[in-house]
């Protein structure tokens, strides 16, 4: 049986929104620090496989649709806002499901962190650059990391739930 935060059919929304707010805060603070420290495209090697850099992503994950002409800014902003509404609804209904709600809170914080970038700058600020030799993974940020961790936890929670139903 799932651990609960409350006895009601739903759960408290505030703790999950608090987690999302923490994600947004750390995401935005790191982006501001990078913007104040680095010139566009500049790279600072921290380890043989990790750099800090400043990249503008006008598209979505991995630069998808980055050169589409500008409409994608508003499409991805609308998608992020739509995801926010759906996630808030799910958190309100299922807030007592801790792992499910944690995963959604991380995804929500990450999505809103990138929506804020699109609204303020017209693009997303990416700065984490992992590489092996000359091969570089696409640069990303803390919001992207929160979305990824949230998605992995969401899959894990669903697999655990399905396995428990057998």
UniProtKB/Swiss-Prot annotation:
A GO BP entry: proteolysis
Catalyzed reaction equations: Release of signal peptides from bacterial membrane prolipoproteins. Hydrolyzes -Xaa-Yaa-Zaa-|-(S,diacylglyceryl)Cys-, in which Xaa is hydrophobic (preferably Leu), and Yaa (Ala or Ser) and Zaa (Gly or Ala) have small, neutral side chains
EC nos: 3.4.23.36
InterPro entries in UniProt: Peptidase_A8
Catalytic EC class: hydrolase
Active site residues according to the UniProt entry: 126, 144
Keyword entries, A-Z: Aspartyl protease, Cell inner membrane, Cell membrane, Hydrolase, Membrane, Protease, Transmembrane, Transmembrane helix
Cellular localisation: Cell inner membrane
GO function terms (MF aspect): aspartic-type endopeptidase activity
Pathway membership, UniProt: Protein modification; lipoprotein biosynthesis (signal peptide cleavage)
UniProt main location, coarse: membrane
Membrane topology summary: Multi-pass membrane protein
Entry annotated with the keyword Transmembrane helix: yes
This protein's record includes keyword Lipid biosynthesis: no
Cellular component annotations (GO), alphabetically ordered: plasma membrane
Pfam families membership: Peptidase_A8 (PF01252)
Domain of life (superkingdom): Bacteria
Residue ranges crossing the lipid bilayer per the database entry: 10-30, 46-66, 71-91, 100-120, 135-155
General function of this protein: This protein specifically catalyzes the removal of signal peptides from prolipoproteins.
Family listed: Belongs to the peptidase A8 family.
PANTHER family: LIPOPROTEIN SIGNAL PEPTIDASE
Protein name, as recorded: Lipoprotein signal peptidase
Recorded name of the encoding gene: lspA
